[in-house]
């Protein structure tokens, strides 16, 4: 049995081997989209994504809470966090401005919904064919976190978060490793050829590790 190295290099991208060996599959019925709420800052975004969110704003505006609308009016769809990185704006130090907790009978403009299920209004509009932008790639790639080391060097790590414990259990039950669960966003970020190379390397290493 050959031990899988902790860090792999695929097409100029450094990858934690945990992305190949750990299992994950979002279990929305259990987590209720709480990742859009928990945390001390918004989701990392690029300048291009900020422009995309601003372009989609008119489409989703009526679906946002009054509190979210107020935050956006004051500081926009994004702000610089304590590390100077641009992230999505948040409400009351909690939920993303584009997240809503809705009940089947409540108006999307009503505050105080008791329904614990959180939805991304950007993704909702995208899936309804109303916008071309789905959501920031950092959201789509979770639990993978991307880090830019400079000089074109990028690293991908597995971010462990207690709120995703059900996703770990579901992924294990389905025998679904992180890199397969995140096939679409990984292709969106790095391309089909890069993802194919990742799969080939993963299959070879995992077969040797048996």
PLM segments and residue spans:
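Short loop/turn segments that flank or connect secondary-structure elements
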Residues: 1-102, 115-210
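A cross-taxon signal for low-complexity, glycine/charged-rich
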Residues: 108-114
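Low-complexity, intrinsically disordered short segments enriched for Gly/Pro and polybasic residues
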Residues: 102-108
